[in-house]
From Swiss-Prot:
Residues 176-235 bind DNA. It is found in: Nucleus. Residues 1-38, 60-138, 156-182 are annotated as: Disordered. This is Homeobox protein engrailed-2-B. Pfam families: Engrail_1_C_sig, Homeodomain. InterPro entries: Engrailed_Homeobox_TFs (IPR050720), HD (IPR001356), HD_engrailed (IPR000747), HD_metazoa (IPR020479), Homeobox-engrailed_C-terminal (IPR019549), Homeobox-engrailed_CS (IPR019737), Homeobox_CS (IPR017970), Homeodomain-like_sf (IPR009057). One of its GO terms (biological process) is neuron differentiation. Belongs to the engrailed homeobox family. GO terms for cellular component: nucleus. PANTHER family: HOMEOBOX PROTEIN ENGRAILED, HOMEOBOX PROTEIN ENGRAILED-2. Residues 1-12, 102-115 have a biased composition (Basic and acidic residues). The gene is en2-b. It comes from Xenopus laevis.
Amino acid sequence: MEENEQNNREVEPQQESGEESNRGILHQAPPGNHQPHHRITNFFIDNILRPEFGRRKERINHQDELFTGRDTGALSGAESGHHRVNVPEGAGGSSKVITVTGEKKSDLAMEETLKSRGLNGDHSLSSDSDSSQASSKATQKPILWPAWVYCTRYSDRPSSGPRSRKPKKKSVSKEDKRPRTAFTAEQLQRLKAEFQTNRYLTEQRRQSLAQELGLNESQIKIWFQNKRAKIKKSTGNKNSLALHLMAQGLYNHATTSKDGKSDSE
């Protein structure tokens, strides 16, 4: 009987030590709901064409595993409300212990890990910032239309129709007018005698008369036209040819004067 009691006493401390060891293991084990932070990758053409596009993810995953392994001891103190985070400061192997409470643990841990990652973290952040800046610049910059849009006829004022240019009136100066011909007495006497014989000159007769009087053909032609107009205006009678054509109904150039009387009256 005494031996059985001794055996029972020896078993009880062994069970107590086993329970204590199990509790220690449970405290050391990381909680099951802890999940590593996954970063969203922006698949822009600029990011894909960079040489460090595929390598960056592998380095981040490897450093995340190292970071979670070092922080198992710090995460075991979640029940007390105070947590210690071991963060590597540089390549020398020295570490820095930070004591945080409550919900600030995850934010500070992420900031310190990004600082410890050095170029990798900075590069990832810079790539994201570059993409966001490019998108913001694209939205802020106004749309640039091609030049031919502004050169078309109806682009700037579609409701006004085609453009019409009004011709500018040329200011007639006195110098542009043709000076009047000053005929001599002999020239006037010869022109009047020629007009008495024939009121209409042929081309050959006009050329010979211009050579004799030393005038241009146009000057002689204009003098004859003016002479016929003066006679017609003074008499008001139509010539025989006009009367013959009017009788046949082939000629009727009657005009109305300011007084309301026509030439035929």
